[in-house]
Amino acid sequence: MAPTVLVVDDEASARAFIERALTQEGYQVLVAAEGEVALNILRSTKRKVALVITDLVMPGMGGHAFALEVGKLPSPPPVLYISAYEAPRGEMSKRFLQKPFSVAALSQAVARLIPQEVKAK
């Protein structure tokens, strides 16, 4: 079965772009418009989520606060941060894509962050 990616972004056009690109790459994609909904998906889905992609700036729970909550889950998936604003510094910058980004850049980032053993299943 293809790896599952959860996409969290308050912009419908961004969610649709990422969902379409990842589906064409063969991934299963779940989407949410806000952090609280995404946490509910992570807690309730039967699928093993291999990667979470989250916008950093969203109404309500922002991407960083959401990622901290994801980290508290059993076996948390890696998180890829996206934003149209300035790139974060430090460790987070290694898992960041500046909007707008190309399908190729998204594909490379996703492939880098999903563990090899997940891709092999």
PLM region spans:
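Conserved phosphotransfer cores of two-component systems
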Residues: 43-47, 69-76, 85-89
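Acidic catalytic/metal-coordinating carboxylates
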Residues: 34-37, 61-66
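Charged docking surfaces used in two-component/phosphorelay signaling
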Residues: 16-24
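Active-site residues of response regulator receiver
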Residues: 55
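Acidic, metal-coordinating helix/loop segments flanking the phosphotransfer/catalytic sites
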Residues: 31-51
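A Lys-centered signature of the CheY-like receiver
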Residues: 99
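Receiver (REC) domain active-site loop signature in two-component systems and cognate sites
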Residues: 58
